[in-house]
């Protein structure tokens, strides 16, 4: 196979991996956790994955502690946990 063909194949595989939705079996287990504001008193707007609605939603984070179901952007949440 030529180098151009290999690059095309690599590009198609990368595109497929980016566009394939995350299934429940592939989703990290922390995506199932409820949002936790943590023990500090900040008021930071963050995003968490909501398993019941299959959506990334807003919550307010205190700034420390909490759990890993805590993202700065919806895109980061969607890429990690799936959802809308």
From Swiss-Prot:
- Residues annotated as site: Reactive bond for trypsin: 41-42
Tell me one GO molecular function of this protein.
Answer: serine-type endopeptidase inhibitor activity
For this chain, the annotated S-S bridges are 31-81, 40-64, 56-77
Q: Which UniProt keywords apply?
A: Disulfide bond, Protease inhibitor, Secreted, Serine protease inhibitor, Signal
Q: Where is the BPTI/Kunitz inhibitor domain?
A: 31-81
Q: Which family does it belong to?
A: Belongs to the venom Kunitz-type family.
**Function text:** Serine protease inhibitor that inhibits trypsin.
Q: What is this protein called?
A: Kunitz-type serine protease inhibitor 7
